[in-house]
Curated annotation (Swiss-Prot):
<dbReference type="GO" id="GO:0005737">
    <property type="term" value="C:cytoplasm"/>
</dbReference>
<dbReference type="GO" id="GO:0019722">
    <property type="term" value="P:calcium-mediated signaling"/>
</dbReference>
<dbReference type="InterPro" id="IPR017441">
    <property type="entry name" value="Protein_kinase_ATP_BS"/>
</dbReference>
<feature type="binding site">
    <location>
        <position position="369"/>
    </location>
    <ligand>
        <name>ATP</name>
    </ligand>
</feature>
<dbReference type="GO" id="GO:0030217">
    <property type="term" value="P:T cell differentiation"/>
</dbReference>
<feature type="region of interest" description="Disordered">
    <location>
        <begin position="260"/>
        <end position="309"/>
    </location>
</feature>
<keyword id="KW-0832">Ubl conjugation</keyword>
<dbReference type="GO" id="GO:0043366">
    <property type="term" value="P:beta selection"/>
</dbReference>
<protein>
    <recommendedName>
        <fullName>Tyrosine-protein kinase ZAP-70</fullName>
        <ecNumber>2.7.10.2</ecNumber>
    </recommendedName>
</protein>
<keyword id="KW-0007">Acetylation</keyword>
<dbReference type="InterPro" id="IPR000980">
    <property type="entry name" value="SH2"/>
</dbReference>
<keyword id="KW-0597">Phosphoprotein</keyword>
<keyword id="KW-1003">Cell membrane</keyword>
<feature type="active site" description="Proton acceptor">
    <location>
        <position position="461"/>
    </location>
</feature>
<comment type="function">
    <text>Tyrosine kinase that plays an essential role in regulation of the adaptive immune response. Regulates motility, adhesion and cytokine expression of mature T-cells, as well as thymocyte development. Also contributes to the development and activation of primary B-lymphocytes. When antigen presenting cells (APC) activate T-cell receptor (TCR), a serie of phosphorylations lead to the recruitment of ZAP70 to the doubly phosphorylated TCR component CD247/CD3Z through ITAM motif at the plasma membrane.</text>
</comment>
<dbReference type="GO" id="GO:0050850">
    <property type="term" value="P:positive regulation of calcium-mediated signaling"/>
</dbReference>
<dbReference type="GO" id="GO:0046638">
    <property type="term" value="P:positive regulation of alpha-beta T cell differentiation"/>
</dbReference>
Amino acid sequence: MPDPAAHLPFFYGSISRAEAEEHLKLAGMADGLFLLRQCLRSLGGYVLSLVHDVRFHHFPIERQLNGTYAIAGGKAHCGPAELCEFYSRDPDGLPCNLRKPCNRPSGLEPQPGVFDCLRDAMVRDYVRQTWKLEGEALEQAIISQAPQVEKLIATTAHERMPWYHSSLTREEAERKLYSGAQTDGKFLLRPRKEQGTYALSLIYGKTVYHYLISQDKAGKYCIPEGTKFDTLWQLVEYLKLKADGLIYCLKEACPNSSASNASGAAAPTLPAHPSTLTHPQRRIDTLNSDGYTPEPARITSPDKPRPMPMDTSVYESPYSDPEELKDKKLFLKRDNLLIADIELGCGNFGSVRQGVYRMRKKQIDVAIKVLKQGTEKADTEEMMREAQIMHQLDNPYIVRLIGVCQAEALMLVMEMAGGGPLHKFLVGKREEIPVSNVAELLHQVSMGMKYLEEKNFVHRDLAARNVLLVNRHYAKISDFGLSKALGADDSYYTARSAGKWPLKWYAPECINFRKFSSRSDVWSYGVTMWEALSYGQKPYKKMKGPEVMAFIEQGKRMECPPECPPELYALMSDCWIYKWEDRPDFLTVEQRMRACYYSLASKVEGPPGSTQKAEAACA
């Protein structure tokens, strides 16, 4: 997941205060000259380095608990770019407003931080180990949940560092530091037997010094009376630049031979999944024989952890178990199906009922589409076509068909997605559901549609009503009644005649020439985006089909929904390009939607936090 400031030309990444000042000197030291850099103290925070009266000023920008960004005592902003734009108009307590960005020289990329270099491998390890996923299921999980997983693993990144020794006594630490070259500044970090505390051991002048590192009630790490940090690795990086109470700066790591490094492979202890985390407490009964606890405590929020798609029973196919796969057939035995007296929905075809399907090793909740008695033969054939199509599809973001049961009626047995359709879920929840959550769900839909595109399927009925929720953070595409499988060499399907089509979701070529392709699904995706970002409003409100067609032919498009981020409306507009061949494909749509979602996930909306303004010394 890229840094939210990575696209800013005046963002330098993980550079020191001295390096920032050198860049500002080279740029001329004009009043209002500024740059942005990563903050070593605050996870996800920044430092604004500013010139005024030929002096340097450094202001830490902290990421608030609600995901906004603020200089201490100042207004909160949804992202670093928005914060800098605000201070370019109003100094609001700074010595002067931001007047001239000190842009990076041509060819110079932002300097990656320590965690940046480890993040991708740690995310992959965490997802693989926590949910036991492999292959495509693993890749889909990494893409869809990277913002959430990154927040979990940042606190354990120190376990991948060469200077971290997970089980070392004070005496053993001294022996290690005295062995070999006794270079001033040689150091290591180890856990102490008191839960949640650590010791930093440092050699200087042939003597080893030990410094206590503890956590405060907010979970921040510090040496007593020293600067506080969100993580241990940030504290170490800071102390490499500034002694800050130590006898000497940290210079050279005393390596742990079993730690993961550039050439090693030992994995860190990954954080427990949020649902298993507890508040820290001193576990005297779990001390090892040498007095050390096996795993440092982690301070966590008392709030209920947010669910991830991988936590649900419908992320992987019920047939992902090789034993269950042996019984996979299109037609199911009625004896294995229990139909509850609970109706989930109804329509012209019949009803959808809740049920349970008994498999070889487990029972699963299912939704059962029951065709009503006396149904026309054509409707029965259409339902069987839908079943044939759905049975071929296997993706976490598509409702899977378990099978068909022919008994008292024709029944399609599908995965349960009990949260209901997306548009109904969002109605009236603008204040409750942030745009970042909506973008998360839309990104999942784009992943499902990219899968269909790769499989050469055209959905033909993509709309918010056909996006079902498993929970607030997990969406699946449903209703494949109009879907078609294209031939290997075909790029579109031509319908023989027009039916009861959802014209407000259809691209011009569908209405005018009955031509359907993955690019016409892209048009429908744009309308689905509009529905979701309008929080369940109806598209083309009060217009009828012919009026919608005329509206589109005149080059008009629906307006940007209120408070919809411009980058999302830009994607929406590209989905509505008139010529189908000029529209993006779902590969491109998913990539752009992913970038929007990641950006919004890193700057969650919320009420401004309140802090006290003060210029602070920071690295």
